[in-house]
């Protein structure tokens, strides 16, 4: 009896990104077959059942198929716009001057608090659509622009709603420990009390967050304050991730590892002890070249140390209104290769397999393996390096989410 599938893509070249395979796990003359939204077969044509059939057979005409892209760190949902601040910066205004004038994160918090859920969804959709147009099939979206319970929950709900409005998998992170709200009057300890005692229990009860994030930095929260948030999150059964070592080395990478974090992100100032701790904890390093570029950082993340210790490397846009208004994972890869000297293979793994690992969803997506969701990106390219090499160019032929 013929083996039946829902859809078959044939005459394709596959970059499977499978673990344990050299390079990108390339298969020439490949076939992908989907059943019930999942990959039922991904491999050489010679291994595919001769009688395999489906109502829809797509001839890829030699195009490349990769796993659907994963953007594992974004702040996609927010109110307002800060393009005017960019103009002020170009005219010579400092961050401090902009903040004193009511700009910076304070302005985004005010605009986000003033927006209802529909307005937040409507504002985020063009940003999401830009990412989907480049083959993104899984995206992480953080809260962190409410800094009080109701708005944080509204941000998370809006993020989940995006996954209903569009064919994309959305993972959400609660980022209540992002910044200090104006009404806290500079009292970080009291605000962290509120995060741990009020916000986190409400978030956990709502079921709207898949993870808990925090920003550990001199301008944000200390190691002790971050530890309190993480301990409370773990007690509620929520995994953690951390904005770490972006502007200074406060030991964020090591603290993330101590709590078994899914990922530590930014990491420009991470030292060897931090890298080694991340390797032992299997915490993924998420590098964010868009923010590095946009705010003109000079300290690069220690890619060689991460390689030395075997830390997995992911890449993400860090899409946000203040430091990385970026909605292109393709450009992100080019930036990582050019600015951080990452290889083509590292970049492509960083926006597929390792991005999925950083979100704790590698069992479900990120590689072309039977049993995973059939999330694909099909490209009009001659070789995978083009996806990293070219700038301002989108060769996506088709995006497939869960087999359709």
From Swiss-Prot:
Cofactor entry: Zn(2+); Fe(3+)
EC numbers for this chain: 3.5.2.7
Stated role: Catalyzes the hydrolytic cleavage of the carbon-nitrogen bond in imidazolone-5-propanoate to yield N-formimidoyl-L-glutamate. It is the third step in the universal histidine degradation pathway.
Annotated positions binding N-formimidoyl-L-glutamate: 145, 320, 322
Binding residues annotated for Zn(2+), in chain numbering: 73, 75, 243, 318
Protein name stated in the entry: Imidazolonepropionase
SUPFAM superfamilies: Composite domain of metallo-dependent hydrolases (SSF51338), Metallo-dependent hydrolases (SSF51556)
Top EC class for this record: hydrolase
Entry binding sites for Fe(3+): 73, 75, 243, 318
Pfam families: Amidohydro_1
HAMAP family: HutI
Entries under PANTHER family matching the protein: IMIDAZOLONEPROPIONASE (PTHR42752), IMIDAZOLONEPROPIONASE-RELATED (PTHR42752:SF1)
Any one GO cellular component localisation term in the record: cytoplasm
GO biological process, one term: L-histidine catabolic process to glutamate and formate
